Amino acid sequence: MWAKTWACGQKRGQNVPMSYVVIFRSTRKLDDGQLYSEWSEKMEALVKTIDGYEHHFGFRDAISRDGVTVSYFTSLEAISQWKNLNEHKMAQQLGRDSFYEEYSVQVCEVLRDYGFEA
């Protein structure tokens, strides 16, 4: 399932401010998911407190357990603030220890934003 999102609530093609995107790709370990769900909810609430956070969306394939989360921020400073929050650092360590078989992170600058809407 793909989610459709627009930066800052604006439609594509309008004067959208500079954005940066963090792409988090991961493969979940096999587990009951309870602790993961708890931490996922905590992190979802926490990221929304970052000045410069815009929005995010994600999806995960139930069979392969591969997932992608795409998060939008207005600045590299906001991304750094998010990365270095103590509670987020605890979640990162839990991810390495308990939640993920592997993951990768890419930080990208949005150069163009356009699309089609019927």
Language-model-derived ranges and their functions:
Residues Q92-G95, F99-E101:
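Short arginine-rich
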